[in-house]
């Protein structure tokens, strides 16, 4: 409704929405304290809530050893994302003085992005791309960054192999995580705390490449050097 009043977005724009703004959120998870580890959620809850049931070689890694890794589980989510605590997050989920709750990732972020794109077209008559983003930590790096967990109406990756560099040499391995780059840039404006900016409009980016879902950003297990 706000977009209609402001006559935004326009054809060719991109809309980046944080996971909590999508209409396909996973269930809210109650967090009884684990009797064995003291964390508010344990491996059984993680597996039941989000862990991919079919083995792919990555599985679940419990990082309980040492203070730096307290209360962390590295999990392959059922959507294919390898992430801390399966993306279960208490930030902005509920009043801290109320019962402990956490939000899970959307059930199907790509479908959420497609529905948002279609609804914007229905209401405004313009075709836009949509990225659903969430904050991820990164191995060997401090700090979280925005990552695309769903997208529709834009390329998720841009294959630059074969394109010339400044000196005419053909690029050999360069594949750009296009949707991730957009998600990270938008995350700077969204913020991580009480900024309350769940949707960001991106203008001026246009790439003539096949549209893909965010699944195109996932490296196949057979190409994973860490598996």
Region locations from a protein language model:
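N-terminal and secondary-structure boundary signal
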Residues: 1-227
């Amino acid at each position: 409704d706000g977009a209609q009043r402001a006559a935004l977005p326009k054809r060719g724009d991109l809309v980046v929405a944080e996971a909590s703004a999508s209409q396909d959120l996973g269930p809210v998870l109650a967090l009884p304290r684990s009797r064995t580890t003291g964390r508010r959620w344990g491996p059984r809850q993680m597996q039941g809530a989000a862990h991919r049931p079919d083995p792919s070689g990555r599985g679940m890694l419990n990082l309980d050893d040492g203070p730096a890794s307290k209360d962390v589980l590295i999990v392959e989510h059922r959507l294919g994302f390898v992430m801390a605590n399966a993306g279960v997050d208490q930030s902005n989920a509920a009043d801290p003085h109320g019962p402990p709750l956490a939000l899970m990732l959307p059930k199907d972020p790509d479908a959420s992005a497609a529905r948002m794109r279609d609804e914007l077209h229905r209401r405004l008559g313009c075709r836009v791309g949509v990225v659903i983003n969430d904050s991820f930590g990164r191995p060997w790096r401090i700090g979280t960054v925005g990552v695309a967990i769903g997208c529709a109406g834009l390329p998720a990756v841009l294959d630059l192999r074969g394109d010339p560099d400044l000196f005419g040499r053909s690029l050999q391995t360069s594949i750009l995580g296009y949707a991730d780059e957009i998600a990270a840039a938008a995350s700077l404006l969204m913020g991580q705390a009480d900024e309350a900016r769940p949707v960001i409009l991106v203008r001026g980016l246009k790439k003539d490449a096949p549209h893909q879902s965010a699944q195109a950003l996932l490296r196949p297990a057979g190409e994973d050097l860490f598996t």
